Amino acid sequence: MQDHGSLPSVLDVHVNVAGRSSVLGKVKSRKARWSVRPSDMSNKTFNPIRAIVDNMKVKPNPNKTMIALSIGDPTVFGNLPTDPEVTQAMKDALDSGKFNGYVPSIGYLSSREEVASYYHCPEAPLEAKDVILTSGCSQAIELCLAVLANPGQNILVPRPGFSLYRTLAESMGIEVKLYNLLPEKNWEIDLKQLESLIDEKTVCLIVNNPSNPCGSVFSRRHLQKILAVAARQCVPILADEIYGDMVFSDSKFEPLATLSSKVPILSCGGLAKRWLVPGWRMGWILIHDRRDIFGNEIRDGLTKLSQRILGPCTLVQGALKSILCRTPRVFYHNTLSFLKSNADLCYGALAAIPGLRPIHPSGAMYLMVGIEMEHFPEFENDVEFTEQLVAEQSVHCLPATCFEYPNFFRVVITVPEVMMLEACSRIQEFCEQHYHCAEGSQEECDK
């Protein structure tokens, strides 16, 4: 046995090819040591909501039951169950034994056909080849960003807006540029400011309608103006429409793709919100590209990217046809009636509180409330305001700093009515205790 003694600092690397020995080169030896570090991607991943909420140092008032108006999960309180047809569809899929194996990463052809059929319309035709099934709408958004943007390029994101856009983009080395929504115009986009952000590295405009966190619903005319900017600047749109059709009776949801054939659009949706099953993780991407601007490259790219996790849950895919076709319209109506009633109740109660400026929502599951900070000088910002609200009243609302929009807070309107009433009463008590008249406005306070 050959005695190597101590290994040299470099090793000759030999390979035998067809009986001939050749030297490929010198390779430095690796010094064996433990050096396990997190990846750059993990270090760049940042969730504003978690960063703020997890660092809250206050505890709820032990004498008051906690009321969480912060969680965007409609199932939390048990008052908004999905329809029996939806659960029966899942039971049938499970009992059939047909949906237990691997499937194409973009989903069963039959399931994609059902989604295409459900959303097809003359203004925005769809076929199965235009549908990618995903593990929830969040993965749909991730795939869209991954296929459209390279590190160093930028995307346009609403402010206030869903924090996941930033979390996903920055983890991939994509720059986020924030365009403003205008509270005085029911959260319409500041189109002039939006267009000023576009440069040679801009590869995607995210439009979230109906909006989380605002609860706003864009009019047809405003959507057409957004599309005009995208067409003029040749920027594709990622339409986050997970709350599509979840609008109140005085508004109408217009799918963005129905209003333009010029702009290529990737529309993201899913079962989570409208069907009240966020834990089932079923989402989709609808590819609208009637001028073939995306071509095969973007479609192929989405397929390749979807192969990283081999598709969403097969059981839910097996249930999709029944879920989409059999869910009765009364289920959707009842859900929206409840949400509108809660929205009206919450808005009315908070609008009567000095120092607060709620903005009435038109859909989704949220409303935003402005804080007139000059009347609450004890608090530096919305984070301190909401922290103290938890400490004194055991009511938890998300500070809108989580959505890049300070001095507002978001209220979730899915809680049972009795809890909403109690929460609003506690918020009123809190504000009355901390409200101070601004200088020169004593007359207003005496009213």
Curated annotation (Swiss-Prot):
- Residue stretches in coiled coil: none
Q: Which InterPro entries match?
A: Aminotransferase_I/II_large, NHTrfase_class1_PyrdxlP-BS, PyrdxlP-dep_Trfase, PyrdxlP-dep_Trfase_major, PyrdxlP-dep_Trfase_small, Tyr_aminoTrfase_ubiquitination, TyrNic_aminoTrfase, Tyrosine_aminoTrfase
Query: What keywords is this UniProt entry annotated with?
Result: Aminotransferase, Phenylalanine catabolism, Phosphoprotein, Pyridoxal phosphate, Transferase, Tyrosine catabolism
Any one Gene Ontology cellular component term annotated for this protein: mitochondrion
In the UniProt record, does the keyword Phosphoprotein occur? yes
Q: What pathway does the UniProt record associate with this protein?
A: Amino-acid degradation; L-phenylalanine degradation; acetoacetate and fumarate from L-phenylalanine: step 2/6
Description of how the protein assembles with itself and partners: Homodimer.
Quote the protein name from its UniProt record: Tyrosine aminotransferase
Name the species this protein comes from: Bos taurus (Bovine)
